[in-house]
Structures are given as C-alpha cells and as structure tokens.
C-alpha cells in the first residue's frame, strides 16, 4: 500500500507505510506473517469460509490481521506479491490527531497476535532507548586510558545496527511502490517513529479510538 501525503506529516506517514509493508512481506516470506493490509489482500473464498470468515472477531478494526493469523494457524499457504500491479494508493491522514488515532487503531490490531510473535517488535521498539540509556550512563572520562576506544567502537556499531537498516528498507519499499525516496525524509520519519511508536503501543492498551462509529 502506497501512502501519498503532503508536508512533514505526510512524509512521515509515507515512509512509515513503506517500512511496515516491507516488514509485512519479510515476515510473510519467513512463514510467520505478523502484519496485513486489507486494502490489497486477497484470499480464496473456500479458505475464508472454511475458517468461519470473520466470525469470532471481537474488535471492530483488525479483521485483516486476525484473518491472516487464523490462516497461518490453519496451515494455509500465505504469500506476498511485491509487484507494481498489486499496489493500492491511499491518502495520508491530513491532521496530527487523525494520524494518532489511525496509529492507535493499527496498534490495537496486535491484540490478535500471539505474545511470542510480539516479542521481537517490542525489542525493536525499546532497543534505541536502552542503547541511549547505556550511552548516557557510561562514565566516559573514567574510561580514558582504559579501553575507551573499544567501548566507543562497540557502541558505534550498536547504533549503526539500529540506524542503517530501516532507511534501506524504506528505499526498497518505495522503489516497489513507485514513490520518490529521500534519505533525509526517511531519517526524519525513522526518528519520529522511534519517539512515538512506544507511546502509541502503550496507549493502545487502554485507549480505544472510534472508527466507523464503533470503538475498536
């Protein structure tokens, strides 16, 4: 799904969607799909009916993720198609409050995913904050003459492991989606995501936004 938007808020959403799409494809190719987007998801009618359709869904939003999870548990074959003809275009939320509400709704979909499957995303969200605490907490002056360079290089490598992969992921995703890529824009979106994603994840545990007239 390609997200088209204007300004800083639109760019953040566009880059975020490209990264999430690539994560969805990666987990699908690994045989453990974590995310799904109903805007361009297709399934066989027979498989859908065999699993009872959407019966049993307890939340107003998330039917796409819940269905994919049921398909996976039933041993159905699930695939991803990274092809321009499969791209669906959507508009970014034009307001900050709208974007926050949308992300609260998306995060709420994780209720349908097993706790074991959520461990890696949770580590991913908390990794930079733990790394920041470690970086700030080190008594750097005391390390002068005592393996200062080694500690600095190890931390630099740890930060590089966090910083480098996602912009490259966004670049590849935007190429598939036919969208222009900017390193600065991707970096800004990555920084913003690092700040708001943990807050959204925690808030989604207690906040249930209204969507299509119902609380999700």
Predicted regions, residues:
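Catalytic donor/gating beta->alpha subdomain of glycosyltransferases that bind UDP-sugars
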Residues: 1-22, 49, 54-117, 214
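Short, P/G- and charge-enriched loop/turn segments at secondary-structure junctions
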Residues: 25-32
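Short loop/turn motifs at secondary-structure junctions and domain boundaries
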Residues: 32-34, 199-200
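Short secondary-structure boundary/capping segments
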Residues: 32-33, 78-79, 208
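Conserved nucleotide-sugar donor-binding
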Residues: 35-51
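Membrane-embedded multi-pass helical conduit in multi-pass membrane proteins
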Residues: 121-208
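Membrane-interface alpha-helices
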Residues: 206-216
């Amino acid at each position: 799904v390609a997200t088209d938007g204007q300004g800083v808020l639109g760019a953040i959403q566009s880059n975020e969607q490209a990264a999430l799409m690539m994560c969805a494809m990666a987990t699908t190719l690994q045989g453990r799909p974590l995310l799904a987007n109903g805007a361009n998801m297709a399934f066989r009618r027979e498989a859908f009916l065999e699993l009872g359709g959407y019966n049993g869904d307890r939340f107003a939003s998330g039917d796409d993720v819940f269905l994919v999870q049921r398909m996976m548990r039933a041993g159905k074959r699930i695939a991803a198609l990274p092809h321009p003809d499969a791209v669906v275009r959507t508009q970014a939320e034009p307001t900050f409050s709208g974007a926050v509400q949308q992300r609260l709704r998306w995060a709420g979909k994780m209720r349908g995913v097993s706790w074991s499957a959520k461990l890696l995303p949770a580590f991913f969200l908390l990794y930079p904050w733990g790394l920041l605490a470690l970086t700030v907490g080190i008594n750097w002056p005391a390390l002068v003459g005592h393996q200062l360079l080694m500690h600095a290089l190890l931390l630099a490598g740890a930060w590089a492991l966090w910083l480098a992969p996602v912009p490259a992921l966004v670049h590849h995703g935007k190429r598939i989606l036919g969208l222009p890529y900017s390193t600065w824009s991707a970096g800004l979106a990555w920084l913003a995501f690092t700040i708001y994603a943990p807050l959204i994840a925690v808030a989604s545990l207690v906040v249930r936004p209204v969507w299509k007239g119902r609380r999700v």
